Structure formats: structure tokens, C-alpha cells
């Protein structure tokens, strides 16, 4: 078992994210995992992730607040415990259009070369 306390989770910089704090809960710099890593993103009001293709298969789960996820031009509003699965390469952006922070659980598969 590998425990990561939120207070000790490594922070990292997510490229093209603005007004978003990110921490790694499992995997990568938080400790080895075999197939995926898990992170938590805190989107402040107005926080965004610019449009970018997903590098690997990805799952988002909103733990608190509301986020607008745009995938290939179609907007979807996600609220408490809503989730979305993105295949590798799907073009997505994320925006917090509310006046309160939103928490997003992020799970991303490791590249196939790392899993093998």
C-alpha cells in the first residue's frame, strides 16, 4: 500500500492551465503505479485548461463545484460526481465559469511504453 496524504502530495505544473493548482496523489513523483496516475486539480473561479489533445486515456471526476468541459467543440457542464472519459488524442478544454472553486479528480493512463 502506498499512502499519499493530501498535505504531502507533490505539486506539479500542468502546461496551459491558468488559475489551477495541481497535485499528484498517486503515480509519477508521488510514487510508482503500474498503469495510471491520479491527480487533483483545484480550479479557482475563472480557471482554465487551454484546448489540448489528451496525451493518454483520461478520466475526470468533479468532486466539488462545476466545470465546463469542451471536447471537440461540444460543451458539457459537469457537477458533483459527474465524470467523463476521454480517449487518447481527444481535443479538450476545461473552464470554471462559476464564482467558487471546483475540484477535479484526474486519472491518466501511462503511455503504453511505460506499462510494458
UniProtKB/Swiss-Prot annotation:
Its main location: secreted. Beta-galactosidase activity is activated by Mg(2+) and significantly inhibited by Ca(2+), Cd(2+), Fe(2+), Ni(2+), Cu(2+) and Zn(2+). Inhibited by EDTA. It catalyses: Hydrolysis of terminal non-reducing beta-D-galactose residues in beta-D-galactosides. InterPro entries: Cupin_2, RmlC-like_jellyroll, RmlC_Cupin_sf. Its EC number is 3.2.1.23. It is found in: Secreted, Cell wall. The keyword Hydrolase applies. Optimum pH is 8.0 with pNP-beta-D-Gal as substrate. Optimum temperature is 40 degrees Celsius with pNP-beta-D-Gal as substrate. Residues 40-107 form the Cupin type-2 domain. Keywords: Cell wall, Glycosidase, Hydrolase, Secreted. One of its GO terms (cellular component) is extracellular region. GO terms for molecular function: hydrolase activity, acting on glycosyl bonds. Disruption phenotype: The knock-down strain shows significantly lower biofilm dispersion compared to the wild type. Induction: Expression is probably maintained throughout planktonic growth at a certain basal level, down-regulated during biofilm growth and promptly up-regulated when dispersal from the biofilm is imminent. Gene3D superfamilies: Jelly Rolls (2.60.120.10). Expression in M.smegmatis, which lacks an ortholog of the protein, changes its colony morphology, cell wall permeability and sensitivity to the cell wall perturbing agent SDS. It also reduces the ability to form biofilms and pellicles, and to autoagglutinate. This is Beta-D-galactosidase Rv1717. It comes from Mycobacterium tuberculosis (strain ATCC 25618 / H37Rv).
Amino acid at each position: 500500500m502506498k499512502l499519499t496524504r493530501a498535505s504531502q502530495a507533490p505539486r506539479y505544473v500542468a502546461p496551459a492551465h491558468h488559475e489551477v493548482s495541481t497535485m499528484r496523489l498517486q503515480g509519477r513523483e508521488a510514487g510508482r503505479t503500474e498503469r495510471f496516475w491520479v491527480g487533483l486539480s483545484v480550479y479557482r473561479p475563472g480557471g482554465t485548461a487551454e484546448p489540448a489533445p489528451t496525451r493518454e486515456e483520461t478520466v475526470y471526476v468533479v468532486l466539488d463545484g462545476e466545470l465546463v468541459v469542451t471536447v471537440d467543440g461540444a460543451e458539457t457542464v459537469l457537477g458533483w460526481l459527474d465524470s467523463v472519459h476521454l480517449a487518447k488524442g481527444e481535443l479538450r478544454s476545461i473552464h470554471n465559469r462559476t464564482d467558487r472553486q471546483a475540484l477535479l479528480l484526474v486519472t491518466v493512463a501511462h503511455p503504453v511504453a511505460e506499462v510494458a
